[in-house]
UniProtKB/Swiss-Prot annotation:
Keyword Membrane: no
Protein name in the entry: Phenol-soluble modulin alpha 3 peptide
Gene coding for it: psmA3
GO biological process, alphabetically ordered: killing of cells of another organism
Note: Peptide production is higher in most prevalent community-associated MRSA strains than in hospital-associated MRSA strains.
Stretches of the chain forming a coiled coil according to its record: none
Domain of life: Bacteria
Family per similarity comment: Belongs to the phenol-soluble modulin alpha peptides family.
Function recorded in the entry: Peptide which can recruit, activate and subsequently lyse human neutrophils, thus eliminating the main cellular defense against infection. Stimulates the secretion of the chemotactic factor interleukin-8 (IL-8). Showed the most pronounced pro-inflammatory and cytolytic activities in the host, thus contributing greatly to virulence and possibly to the development of disease.
Record-linked InterPro entries: PSM_alpha, PSM_alpha_peptides
Keywords from the UniProt entry: Cytolysis, Formylation, Virulence
Keyword Transcription: no
Induction of its expression: Up-regulated by agr.
Post-translational modification N-formylmethionine, affected residues: M1
Organism: Staphylococcus aureus (strain MW2)
Length: 22
């Protein structure tokens, strides 16, 4: 399940970057 946790964090950080830029 470590892969899922990393994948979730990746999308979370990516989404945060998009929302933070706007």
């Amino acid at each position: 399940m470590e892969f899922v946790a990393k994948l979730f964090k990746f999308f979370k950080d990516l989404l945060g970057k998009f929302l933070g830029n706007n």
